């Protein structure tokens, strides 16, 4: 069974999140706070939210530049006026502030040298993210608007009175501290932090490999039962 088969099954059955069967160390909470205290967070996607900020522990710089300085590149290269062919990827200086988070990311199943943006995401008290989805023209054109494997969203610290939910059904993603999900960002979704604390999440892009595919199958069976694996194996691709 491939991750494409799992993605197709989730799309067909309107499954928009899959909890990752893996432990996230609590030290990531303290390191997210340290990144905040050091002043690394920058405003993210003007117009899509209020109090929504980001800082990259792994990102890109213009080719030939020092990758450690790419922490403020929180969008794709074209969002910063660069092309894919004109950038180098690597760990940023935030890795020195969050060494255990970096260590965990290095141990997380991934293809060597294929990570893209790895970002701390902050939603400040009273902050909100407006109704949107993260698909693009290519995904839409290829019928892949819905894509459970498109991104991984980790909740390092999830205050009470704080949600990320589908816009249509108002169903909330069941975040708790130190939990992670494959999240279908092609679904229209919105977020609100009604608490008086910072919400610290982390979004991962890139690195899919066979070991992560195995983790995806394992997580799917834990959430929906082993019978679903047989169902997916028997479906037409």
Predicted regions and their residues:
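Generic structural motif
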Residues: 23-27, 123-126, 157-159, 207-211
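Short, flexible, solvent-exposed loop/turn segments with mixed acidic/basic and small polar residues
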Residues: 5-10, 140-142, 193
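Intrinsic-disorder/low-complexity, polar/charged segments enriched in Ser/Thr/Lys/Arg/Asp/Glu/Gln
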Residues: 15-19, 149-151, 201
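Structured loops at beta-to-helix junctions and adjacent beta-edge loops in soluble globular domains
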Residues: 55-63, 72-75, 123, 157, ...
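Catalytic core of non-heme Fe(II) oxygenases with the double-stranded beta-helix
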Residues: 104-181
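Catalytic core of Fe(II)/2-oxoglutarate
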Residues: 158-237
